[in-house]
Amino acid sequence: MKLTCMVIVAVLFLTANTFVTAVPHSSNALENLYLKAHHEMNNPKDSELNKRCYDGGTGCDSGNQCCSGWCIFVCL
């Protein structure tokens, strides 16, 4: 019985600790997340989910065009 209670308390403590440390240090992080999502709904072409990247072997100008992030005249 004592062991079960100790395990439950430990799990609750670790869960609370995870939530506290996982939150960004900005006090308005949720507001910024909401505004970004709202902007992406209004401007779907600007959404990061819609960005296209080139597969390996395709010609490129910079690494940010390639899915792998590596560009030496062609995507690697």
UniProtKB/Swiss-Prot annotation:
* Cystine residue pairs: 53-67, 60-71, 66-75
One annotated GO molecular function: toxin activity
GO (cellular component) term, any one = extracellular region
List the keywords (alphabetical): Cleavage on pair of basic residues, Disulfide bond, Ion channel impairing toxin, Knottin, Neurotoxin, Secreted, Signal, Toxin
A Pfam family per the record: Conotoxin
Compartment(s) of residence: Secreted
Q: Where is the signal peptide?
A: 1-22
**Where does tissue-level expression of this protein occur?**
Expressed by the venom duct.
Q: Which InterPro entries match?
A: Conotoxin
| Propeptide cleavage-removed residue intervals | 23-52
Q: What is the similarity comment for this entry?
A: Belongs to the conotoxin O1 superfamily.
**What does the entry's free-text domain comment contain?**
The presence of a 'disulfide through disulfide knot' structurally defines this protein as a knottin.
Q: What is this protein's name?
A: Conotoxin Vc6.6
Which species is the source of this protein?
A: Conus victoriae
What does the organism's lineage look like at the top?
Answer: Eukaryota, Metazoa, Spiralia, Lophotrochozoa, Mollusca
